[in-house]
Amino acid sequence: MQHHHSVDASGVFSGPVGADLRAKLASDENVLAALQVDLSADLRFVSGWVVVTSRRLLARAPGATVSRDWALAPGLALKLQHHGGVGTLELHNPQERVAFWRFTLGHHPQALRLVQRFEQQVERGA
């Protein structure tokens, strides 16, 4: 089984975390954008990741031992904001916020790219 990734996500895919993420991808699932998140919900420096694929959004919150995923579907939205040097990426369904991740602003360009690719895939009806 071979995986073809559409972006250079080498930072996200290195080490044991990368092996775990690669194991979660279907053989025909492409990574379109990746974001390293480096702040926990209580603003401690801990690593995590958020990835948009051709089918879904996958994430491992900083400090978490398991990842979560959401199928890309109409009604899902990613909202990006920053305040005081901290970026926040929020995932919303039509009713509520279902997840959020925090990161230092050095990762803001990755976050912008991730939101853009997410929106493109949702519009296409992934």
Where in the sequence are the language-model features?
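The phosphoinositide-binding surface of pleckstrin homology
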Residues: 26-44
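Acidic, Ser/Thr- and proline-rich intrinsically disordered linker/docking segments
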Residues: 2-13, 20-23, 40-47, 60-126
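Structural motif
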Residues: 55-57
